[in-house]
Amino acid sequence: MRVGTWICLPGRPGRCRKQHDLGNCPEVPGIFKTLALSPGAPDMMQQPRVETDTIGAGEGPQQAVPWSAWVTRHGWVRWWVSHMPPSWIQWWSTSNWRQPLQRLLWGLEGILYLLLALMLCHALFTTGSHLLSSLWPVVAAVWRHLLPALLLLVLSALPALLFTASFLLLFSTLLSLVGLLTSMTHPGDTQDLDQ
């Protein structure tokens, strides 16, 4: 097992820009190899560690974390917050910008609804005009052929309708006369019915 000290200088998340292996330096004797420090490095970076592979054989540094894992674990949020100016963070934490933004979004929503209504009206008008233009020959044919046929049918059925109306009128008159004669021949029944 190889024991070495790796010092990583800051770079993009998941990767080290430069590494220093102090484990094999002849100037660092014995067990102090694991505690060797690079001159000028910050205290937080002067931490010795042991690099081994998956089976523990000590085959060098571990593989760097890919960008996809950095994005999926939301490391970019922390990176953005650490690099964002404090004035931006203060502006974001306040609610003064939310009301104008909400009004702007409401205005955009109203404009979109108005455009949608205009598009629907245009579609209905266009479809209706196309339907009327396509149905106009049918309406003209009905006006020329079917309407005269209907008028002729009504005129031909008019005598039959008059005869039926006169027959119903005569039948109702006969029923009235029968009722009148019955009341005159049996006046007692009429009085009983009135009581």
From Swiss-Prot:
Transmembrane regions listed in the UniProt entry: 105-125, 145-171
Q: Which UniProt keywords apply?
A: Membrane, Transmembrane, Transmembrane helix
The record's section on InterPro entries has:
TMEM239
Whether Transcription counts among this entry's keywords is no
Q: What is the membrane topology here?
A: Multi-pass membrane protein
One GO cellular component from the entry? membrane
From the Swiss-Prot or TrEMBL record, state where the protein is found.
Answer: Membrane
Keyword Transmembrane helix listed:
yes
Provide the protein name.
Transmembrane protein 239
Gene giving rise to this polypeptide: TMEM239
